[in-house]
């Protein structure tokens, strides 16, 4: 008997100028939760990445509604991932001709939803 693969929808955003460590802290809060509950949690978080993740999650929900005609109440966050993107390297000048490197990190955020 063939098992059916669960219907999944996803959304991703690339080259976000936020450190992946900061984004992962928020993504860990919404993993495994229903989409509606995750949206509510993100709406009231005071952190900068939470607004980006909120918009991305809304996009994933609307992708699921458009592609599979599913209600937002039956969706859950299957996977929430923040991968490291390219690092922008800058130089901060200091005294006596020295210069210290600054790494401006970027990340790629991916959210996958599945039906409960």
Curated annotation (Swiss-Prot):
The entry describes its oligomerization and partners as: Part of the 50S ribosomal subunit.
- Record carries keyword NAD: no
Name of the protein in its database record? Large ribosomal subunit protein uL22c
> What species does this protein belong to?
Euglena gracilis
Offer one example of a GO biological process linked to this entry: translation
Pfam families reported for this sequence: Ribosomal_L22
Cellular localisation: Plastid, Chloroplast
PANTHER family documented for this protein? CHLOROPLAST 50S RIBOSOMAL PROTEIN L22-RELATED, LARGE RIBOSOMAL SUBUNIT PROTEIN UL22M
Please state the gene responsible for encoding this protein. Answer: rpl22
């Amino acid at each position: 008997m063939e098992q059916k693969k669960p219907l999944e929808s996803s959304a991703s955003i690339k080259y976000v100028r936020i450190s992946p460590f900061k984004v992962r802290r928020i993504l860990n809060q919404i993993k495994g939760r229903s989409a509606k509950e995750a949206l509510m949690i993100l709406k009231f978080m005071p952190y900068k990445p939470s607004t980006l993740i909120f918009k991305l999650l809304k996009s994933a929900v609307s992708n699921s509604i458009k592609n599979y005609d599913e209600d937002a109440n039956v969706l859950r966050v299957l996977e929430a991932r923040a991968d490291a993107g390219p690092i922008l390297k800058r130089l901060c000048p200091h005294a006596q001709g020295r210069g210290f490197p600054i790494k401006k990190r970027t990340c790629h955020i991916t959210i996958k939803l599945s039906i409960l």
